[in-house]
């Protein structure tokens, strides 16, 4: 039997899974490859609370809107590996009850984009579509773990290419570093999908080799005080750190200019620090707190 194409395979699965899971989550089952709604969407009460405030944010510029939503998430507990929701199936998902550094900025941005839709479409289904747009290569989840953008620098390149964000890193004085891009291959036991699917390891290694073959451009932290005036509320700030003689992306958050005029770093801070989403100190000061932090990437949401 000839191999099914992706489009054929998805069409077949959509028909079958709609029948199997319609009672659990009408209208969502096909898009989420048969995973139950309560697996892919956690924290409905928090989502509804955000929707109730959406009218006051919807007319803000996308960056300010993203940061305003991020500000409402301050205090949310830090929780890692929230995207590892199944042994085999990859699907767009969210957990509003616990966020890591990546899902914090991602949830804030996806919700901000959802507010561009008519109000009757401010739904979990629409929100998950915005997550898919941002999280997956080319904006499409295929049901495969490999369709997710796992490295921030690849995410930035892909989203910049599609006109969703603007990569400001080089024009703000970046320098190239040798990209390490090896975390997943080295630490594969920490990833549920990779533990249960050993055959993924070779493909992940190929992906890391591709990402790592390109220089990682970053703005040295010594230059950050001089560019803070050029950064805007809602800019996505990726942290680059030393990895031996190489450099890798290690953390991410949002820029937010507070009422005192200071450009601060808003992020989901790990349990060894605050263990929750916080508005931290001035961005340049935050970088100087950690000797291993080398500098930053900057992406500006466009739509």
What are the language-model segments listed below?
Residues 1-8:
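N-terminal secretory signal peptides that target proteins for export/translocation
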Residues 9-13:
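N-terminal export leaders
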Residues 14-24:
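Bacterial N-terminal signal peptides
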Residues 24-31:
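Boundary at the C-terminal end of the N-terminal hydrophobic targeting segment
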Residues 31-108:
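Cationic-aromatic interfacial patches
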Residues 73-214, 261, 267-270:
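Acidic/His-rich structured neighborhood in mature extracellular/periplasmic domains
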Residues 230-231:
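Short, well-ordered loop/turn sites that connect or cap secondary structure elements
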Residues 235-303:
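C-terminal soluble interaction/assembly domains
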């Amino acid at each position: 039997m000839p191999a099914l194409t992706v489009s054929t395979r998805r069409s077949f699965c959509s028909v079958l899974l709609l029948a199997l899971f319609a009672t659990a989550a009408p209208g969502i089952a096909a898009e989420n490859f048969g995973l139950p709604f309560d697996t892919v969407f956690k924290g409905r009460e928090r989502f509804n609370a955000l929707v109730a405030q959406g009218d006051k944010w919807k007319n803000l510029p996308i960056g300010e809107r993203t940061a305003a939503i991020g500000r409402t998430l301050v205090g949310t507990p830090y929780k890692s590996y929230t995207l590892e929701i199944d042994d085999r199936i990859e699907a767009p998902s969210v957990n509003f009850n616990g966020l890591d550094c990546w899902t914090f900025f991602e949830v804030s941005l996806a919700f901000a984009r959802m507010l561009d839709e008519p109000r009757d479409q401010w739904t979990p289904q629409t929100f998950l579509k915005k997550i898919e747009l941002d999280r997956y290569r080319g904006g499409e989840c295929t049901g495969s773990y490999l369709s997710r953008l796992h490295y921030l620098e690849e995410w930035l390149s892909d989203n910049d290419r599609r006109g969703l964000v603007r990569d400001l890193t080089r024009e703000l004085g970046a320098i190239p570093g040798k990209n390490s891009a090896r975390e997943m291959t080295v630490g594969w036991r920490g990833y549920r999908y990779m533990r249960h699917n050993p055959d993924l390891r070779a493909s992940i290694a190929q992906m890391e080799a591709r990402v790592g073959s390109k220089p990682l451009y970053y703005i040295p932290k010594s230059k950050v005080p001089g560019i803070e005036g050029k950064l805007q509320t809602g800019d996505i700030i990726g942290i680059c750190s030393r990895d031996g003689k190489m450099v890798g992306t290690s953390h991410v958050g949002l820029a937010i200019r507070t009422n005192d005029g200071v450009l601060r770093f808003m992020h989901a801070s790990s349990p060894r620090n605050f263990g929750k989403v916080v508005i931290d100190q001035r961005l340049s000061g935050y970088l100087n707190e950690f000797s291993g932090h080398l500098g930053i990437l900057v992406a500006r949401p466009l739509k």
